[in-house]
């Protein structure tokens, strides 16, 4: 096509950029040999195409121009060969406070993590390094970083909290066995596990001594608010107080349409009239007809707080509820 006059420099070397990003090394070579300008390329456009990057480096592409992107993207994507090539050609392993190591840890690329650390990456550049790996459930990376001296207690034991929140039981167990403080921030790890419905983690932490009553029954309140019935049952069966904060659990379960949780709490003595029948008022204004019907059938006062259960849903357009309550 070039031999018949096709212009290859159109739109800022678009043909070259497209061939590079698609990994077509033969096309890249052909275009460059016919005058295409390498200087328009950014290596991070082609971060996973090793042969293209090799060719670009060998032909004068400046990898330092794009340090902020290229090595970071290669590490983030787990492209070990590319990471190796970039570092051997002078890319800065410490770019952006060791961001390549951060992203490799966060995305679960163990071999890249090992390579970066063995080549001088600083595991202490980010206090949250173990946190990132724990949040992602990357147990082998967590173990490797801890073995290399990373602090599992960084940011007030944030690693354990995020592993609990994200549902990674094996990571939670490992961190606790290594001395992570599951009582940090008034049992925040337990609360997060309850909020997200990770029953096995909840059980494990409670068995290890986490306090289900911390912060005025926050664990039960969060589990109820989020609708995790099995977690709610477990907590109540282990002594959690369903009346904490004026039956907060019942109120928030009503607000968020968790009928099964509402039923369970009431079967276990929750006060339907707490805070001037707040459960009914919340269910009503938020348009939860089945919940409203259930609460009324079980004695909720539709006239509480100056008929709020009747008036507020009207303003929200919940005509079915208004008609039912009238």
Swiss-Prot record:
Q: Which domain of life is it from?
A: Viruses
State the ANK repeat positions.
11-40, 42-65, 66-95, 96-125, 127-154, 155-184, 185-214, 216-244, 246-274, 275-304
Q: Which InterPro entries does the record match to this protein?
A: Ankyrin_rpt, Ankyrin_rpt-contain_sf
PROSITE patterns noted in UniProt: ANK_REP_REGION, ANK_REPEAT
In the UniProt record, does the keyword tRNA processing occur? no
Per UniProt, which keywords does this protein have? ANK repeat, Repeat
- One Pfam family assigned to this protein is Ank
Positions of transmembrane segments: none
| Protein name (database record) | Putative ankyrin repeat protein L25
- Species of origin reads Acanthamoeba polyphaga mimivirus (APMV)
């Amino acid at each position: 096509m070039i031999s018949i006059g096709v212009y290859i420099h159109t739109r800022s070397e678009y043909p070259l950029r497209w061939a590079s990003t698609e990994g077509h090394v033969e096309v890249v070579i052909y275009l460059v040999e016919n005058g295409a300008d390498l200087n328009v390329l950014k290596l991070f456009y082609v971060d996973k195409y090793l042969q293209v990057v090799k060719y670009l480096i060998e032909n004068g592409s400046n990898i330092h121009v794009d340090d902020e992107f290229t090595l970071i993207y290669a590490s983030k994507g787990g492209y070990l060969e590319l990471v190796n090539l970039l570092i051997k050609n002078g890319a800065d392993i410490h770019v952006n406070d060791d961001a390549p190591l951060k992203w490799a840890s966060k995305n679960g690329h163990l071999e890249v993590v090992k390579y970066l650390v063995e080549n001088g990456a600083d595991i202490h550049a980010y206090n949250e390094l173990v946190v990132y790996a724990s949040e992602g459930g990357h147990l082998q990376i967590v173990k490797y970083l801890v073995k290399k001296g990373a602090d599992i207690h960084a940011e007030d034991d944030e690693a354990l909290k995020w592993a609990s929140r994200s549902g990674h039981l094996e990571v939670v167990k490992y961190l606790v066995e290594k001395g992570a403080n599951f009582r940090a921030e008034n049992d925040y790890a337990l609360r997060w596990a309850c909020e997200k419905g990770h029953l096995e983690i909840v059980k494990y932490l409670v068995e290890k001594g986490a306090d289900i009553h911390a912060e005025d029954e926050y664990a039960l309140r969060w589990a109820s608010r989020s609708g995790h019935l099995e977690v709610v049952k477990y907590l109540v069966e282990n002594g959690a107080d369903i009346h904490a904060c004026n039956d907060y659990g019942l109120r928030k379960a009503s607000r968020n349409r968790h009928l099964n949780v509402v039923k369970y709490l009431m079967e276990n003595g929750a006060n339907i009239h707490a805070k001037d029948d707040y459960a009914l008022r919340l269910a009503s204004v938020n348009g939860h007809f089945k919940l409203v019907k259930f609460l009324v059938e079980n004695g909720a006062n539709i006239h509480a707080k100056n008929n709020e259960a009747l008036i507020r849903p009207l303003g929200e357009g919940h005509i079915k509820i208004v008609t039912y309550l009238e």
